A protein has these predicted regions:
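Glycine/serine-rich anion-binding loops at beta->alpha junctions
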Residues: 87-116, 134, 241-243
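Short, basic/glycine-rich phosphate-binding loops at helix/coil junctions
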Residues: 46-60, 108, 130, 205-214
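A generic local secondary-structure boundary/capping motif
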Residues: 28-30, 136, 152-158
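Contiguous, small/hydrophobic- and glycine-enriched helical/loop subdomains that border
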Residues: 105, 109-146
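Conserved, helical-rich catalytic subdomain that frames metal- and/or nucleotide-binding sites
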Residues: 141, 146-241
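ATP-binding N-lobe of GHMP and related small-molecule kinases
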Residues: 1-96, 114, 118-123, 159-160, ...
């Protein structure tokens, strides 16, 4: 079975507060991209283990891979005994904030549900995937959404304008944990602008969108990898886009 795993961008991202569980309460706008990984998911009839492989050798595919975690969580929830092979044809950049690992996990779940003919509500899927990673519930929805808290609250919305996106990634990557550690070290103040940005998208108000789009993690990321600022400076020479 073939499943596509779509990348996302955070058009804006705010951090509201720290959580007792070590995560952060977020408020962000996530938009799906056409860029996607392709997963081949199949049942293993005579196996006592699951296998995840990938054509990008930089991807960690051990037991801590999100696809492995998803399969184990699904097995515990629904009690099935079957095992699976998942092969990932990787197109989404690693360590680029595009949610590739989360998208792969969500695609794996969709494949398992279809192969085993599991009847599950969207609420069940959101609850299950929220235990795997903050971006995985959105990857199940895969629509423009305001995403809140730990990623489990999704507010889908629609807008008409079609956007072209240029993705530029430095050769080096950044881990999410590394960026949030730097954010906590430096301190932060919530911006509370997500509603205004959503409204500007819906109303096709490009000027308001340009004035307010932001990512609170940008500062920590640039502190760790200054090359990001160099890329922004180059892109800012083309004033018609959002950087």
């Amino acid at each position: 079975m073939i499943e596509k795993a779509y990348a996302k961008i955070n058009l804006s991202l705010d951090v509201l507060s720290n959580r007792d569980d070590g995560y952060h309460n977020l408020e962000t706008i996530m938009l799906p991209l056409e860029l996607h990984d392709t997963l081949a998911i199949s049942l293993l009839k005579q196996s006592t283990d699951d296998f995840v492989t990938c054509d990008d050798f930089n991807l960690h595919i051990g037991k801590y891979n999100l696809c492995h975690k998803l399969i184990e969580s699904a097995r515990k929830k629904w009690g099935f005994s079957e095992h699976f092979r998942v092969h990932i044809h990787k197109n989404i950049f690693l360590q680029a904030g595009l949610g590739g690992g989360s998208a792969d996990a969500a695609a794996t779940l969709r494949g398992i549900i279809k192969l085993l003919k599991i009847n599950a509500s969207k609420e069940e899927l959101i609850e299950l995937t929220s235990q795997i990673g903050s971006d995985v519930p959105w990857a199940i929805e895969n629509k423009p959404c305001v995403v809140k808290y730990k990623g489990e609250v999704l507010e889908p919305f629609e807008f008409n304008k079609k956007w072209y996106v240029i993705l530029v990634k430095p050769e080096s990557g950044l881990s999410t944990q590394e960026i949030f550690n730097k954010l906590n070290q430096d301190g932060y103040k919530p911006m509370y602008k997500i509603d205004k940005i959503k409204e500007s998208l819906v109303n096709d108000d490009i000027n308001t969108l340009k004035e307010n789009v932001f990512n609170i993690l940008e500062g920590p990321a640039i502190s760790i990898l200054p090359e990001i600022q160099d890329i922004k400076n180059q892109l800012s020479k083309y004033p018609k886009g959002l950087t």
